[in-house]
Structure formats: C-alpha cells, structure tokens
C-alpha cells in the first residue's frame, strides 16, 4: 500500500499508509476502522511494528477531546489484533495547541459513545 499525506493540526503533513482494516462488533453492531503505519516505521528510534489507530466517536467534544483520540497498536503475529478502548488517549494538541497532531480521518468515525479511555480535562 502506498503512503499518503495525513493532515495535522499544523502545516505539517505525516506520511501514513493504511496497514489494515480492523473489523469488530460492539453491542451487536459491526464496525470497521483503518489502522495506519507511518513511513518512519523502522527508522532509528521508531518501532517497525508500531501501528496508529486514530478514531472519532460520539463522546468527542462532550466528555472527550473534540478532535478524537488515539490508540497505539503493534503488528500482530497472526491476523487478529485486540482493540482495547481503555487504552484510548488524547493527542498532545488536546493539552497545547502548539503540538502538531494528525487529524483523525473521517472514515474512522464510530457512531456511538465510547466511554472507555482518557476523558477531557479541565483547566484549573
């Protein structure tokens, strides 16, 4: 699969490719999300097996960061990969807009409220 330019919250563009399509079921509803691998995978200090799963859901902007959340995954040995939404985290730009964060592709939208993982925070 060829690499494409994924937009970020700044002018920077990351080079990603769709590594695979993750198919799963939540509450008897089937869903699919693209999982990505960066062009830098395998370079110095970058794990060759690292995969990037950005997603949007109904909680964004309400109880979670409006721009979506990410889950870090790794290339599986077989053809099964476990998605643990408890591992969902906010991108760095949720905390400081000076960071450059990949914008979650619209096709990675889940039309339900994912209550697991990191939530929004309040400034104190």
Regions picked out by a protein language model, each given a short descriptive name:
Residues 40-48, 73-81, 122:
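Short, surface-exposed linear segments at secondary-structure transitions and domain or protein termini
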Residues 88-124:
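Extended, aromatic/histidine-rich regions of cofactor-dependent oxidoreductases associated
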Residues 25-27, 34-36, 56, 74-76, ...:
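A structural detector for beta-sheet-dominated domains
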Residues 49-51, 79-81, 97, 108:
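A short pocket-lining beta-strand/turn micro-motif at the edge of beta-sheets
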Residues 52-89:
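Acidic, glycine-rich flexible loop segments
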Residues 30, 39, 59-61, 77, ...:
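Residues that cap or initiate secondary-structure elements
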Residues 29-33, 69, 81, 110-112:
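Short beta-strand segments
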Residues 3-66:
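Mid-length scaffold segments of soluble, non-membrane domains
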